[in-house]
Amino acid sequence: MSLDKGTKEEITKKFQLHEKDTGSADVQIAILTEHITELKEHLKRSPKDQNSRLALLKLVGQRRKLLEYLNSTDTERYKNLIARLNLRK
């Protein structure tokens, strides 16, 4: 269920703040969102896969914490990122 290197690089290029940015909250949230989307699709096909369900809950929690951090440090970037990723908040 992990993302391949090419997908991560595409997401990083799309959401990075500067040329060498690979770990900002924006990039991490975007990668987690893509991973969550893939896990949701997997769980639609395999509803009894409890390990994947737990992994999904863990990833959602990580993303929520990063979103809270971004909202507390830079509200404008937070709102922009929410709009770009089509997340509810």
From Swiss-Prot:
SUPFAM superfamilies xrefs: S15/NS1 RNA-binding domain
Keywords: Ribonucleoprotein, Ribosomal protein, RNA-binding, rRNA-binding
GO biological process, one term: translation
Any one Pfam family match given in the protein's UniProt record, by short name: Ribosomal_S15
Keyword Ribonucleoprotein: yes
PROSITE patterns: RIBOSOMAL_S15
Record-stated family: Belongs to the universal ribosomal protein uS15 family.
Name by which UniProt lists this protein: Small ribosomal subunit protein uS15
Organism expressing this protein natively: Chlamydia trachomatis serovar D (strain ATCC VR-885 / DSM 19411 / UW-3/Cx)
Lineage, opening ranks: Bacteria, Pseudomonadati, Chlamydiota, Chlamydiia, Chlamydiales
